[in-house]
């Protein structure tokens, strides 16, 4: 142990600075067949071509709000790791209770 307390780098040598990949337009990773499979699971038979971009936009805004709330819970607990309970509580706050992950 280096004696620097919980999670602190302290003085002296820090870790290597890593280059982070700049993420842009990752929502396109939700492919057309993936959206089609989700719709099929929901009982949809035919899908308009305009739906795919709309679904991506709705999914992105939903995930942004859940992640924002989850990170708020994490920061309040003075942690750096988002836990499954943080996500469960964030979903519960938005009125979408999720069972099976504790809490």
Swiss-Prot record:
The modification N6-succinyllysine is found at residues 32, 78. The modification N6-acetyl-N6-methyllysine is found at residues 6, 13. GO terms for molecular function: DNA binding; identical protein binding; protein heterodimerization activity; structural constituent of chromatin. The modification Omega-N-methylarginine is found at residue 56. It is found in: Nucleus; Chromosome. SUPFAM superfamilies: Histone-fold. Residues 1-14 have a biased composition (Gly residues). Its main location: nucleus. Belongs to the histone H4 family. This is Histone H4. It comes from Saccharomyces cerevisiae (strain ATCC 204508 / S288c). The lineage of its organism: Eukaryota, Fungi, Dikarya, Ascomycota, Saccharomycotina. The gene is HHF1.
